[in-house]
């Protein structure tokens, strides 16, 4: 859990200097225009990205599991864990199948891209399958978990 928590945290943290140095990527034909120029506004907008959100959810829940001897029992924790796992898998699939191909022109950008769009979407579900306590995804928790990505999409 330590590694599967630390890597998405590093990915989220390295997003901020990328936002300071690069304009928003606005992909043609996706239905929106504008974006943020490089600088504080783009850096502070990083948490609005689905990639950032999904990696932050995985980081927070993985580090919580790593810090505790026994797994949390609350519906809220396991709903957030489930939302993070599902969201980071969606991030990996959508980015690599649809959005990949944009130029990553710095080492930090390439590192961040690989971490958040390839490594974490594979590592998080693998760690979940190997180490998470069984029986934590219930219909109630799955329903609660769906609220997070739906709120992001709204």
What are these regions (language model features)?
Residues 76-79, 104-116, 139-141:
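Non-cytosolic membrane-interface motifs at loop->transmembrane helix junctions
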Residues 38-56:
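Interfacial helix-start motif at the membrane-water boundary
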Residues 7-29:
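Alpha-helical transmembrane segments of multi-pass membrane proteins
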Residues 26-44:
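Perimembrane loop-to-helix junctions flanking transmembrane segments
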Residues 72-87, 136-147:
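Interfacial segments of alpha-helical transmembrane regions
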Residues 96-105:
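Juxtamembrane "helix-exit" motif on the non-cytosolic side of transmembrane helices
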Residues 121-137:
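Alpha-helical transmembrane segments in multipass membrane proteins, preferentially the mid-helix core
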Residues 8-16, 88-97, 148-154:
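Aromatic-anchored segments of alpha-helical transmembrane domains
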């Amino acid at each position: 859990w330590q590694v599967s928590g630390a890597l998405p945290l590093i990915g989220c943290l390295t997003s901020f200097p990328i936002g300071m140095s690069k304009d928003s990527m606005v992909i043609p034909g996706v239905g929106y225009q504008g974006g943020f120029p490089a600088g504080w506004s783009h850096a502070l907008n990083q948490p609005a990205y689905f990639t950032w959100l999904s990696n932050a959810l995985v980081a927070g829940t993985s580090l919580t599991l790593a810090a505790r001897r026994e797994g949390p029992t609350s519906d809220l924790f396991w709903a957030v864990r489930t939302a993070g796992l599902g969201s980071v898998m969606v991030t990996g699939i959508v980015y690599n199948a649809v959005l990949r191909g944009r130029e990553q022109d710095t080492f930090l950008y390439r590192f961040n891209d690989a971490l958040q769009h390839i490594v974490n979407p594979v590592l998080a579900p693998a760690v979940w399958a190997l180490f998470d306590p069984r029986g934590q995804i219930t219909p109630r928790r799955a329903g609660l978990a769906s609220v997070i990505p739906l709120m992001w999409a709204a």
